[in-house]
Amino acid sequence: MAKIKAKISESEALAKLAALGMDNKKGLDIVMLDLREIESAPTNFFVICSGNVPSHVSAICDGVFETIKKATGLNPNRIEGYENAEWILMDYFDIVVHIFLKDKRQHYRLEELWADGKEIKIETNSAKSNSKE
């Protein structure tokens, strides 16, 4: 039983690293969805954010990749959508990272589709800076 808890803990830590990578590249509206209680979920966590333009979306993807690689040595199993950078998906098995252009995020509404998951708001560096003013 302890082995399973460690695995879940590792996936949550990985999701938080992804969120940190997003925040480092000024990703917008960063959300973690905990899907562990959903039997049919394809992964333990979704980590979702938006970018302003395709180059911003690509930069966020690069930031997530670098942050996770530096901290854990892990590479994603697969990255989809990097070429057009409207919706990039990074599959790390235990977590899946979604980086959208704002309008694509509104169109696909992943947070609504997976509303049974527990939404975990991420406190970002930009939010901390704004609250100090």
Describe these PLM feature segments.
Residues K69:
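Post-Walker A helix-loop "phosphate-sensing" segment adjacent to the P-loop in P-loop NTPases
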Residues I48-S50:
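Short hydrophobic/aromatic beta-strand micro-patches
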Residues I60-F65:
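Short amphipathic alpha-helices in soluble, non-transmembrane regions
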Residues P42-F46:
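Short beta-strand segments
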Residues M1-I38, P54-A59, T72-L74, E80-Y82, ...:
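Long, contiguous binding/interaction regions
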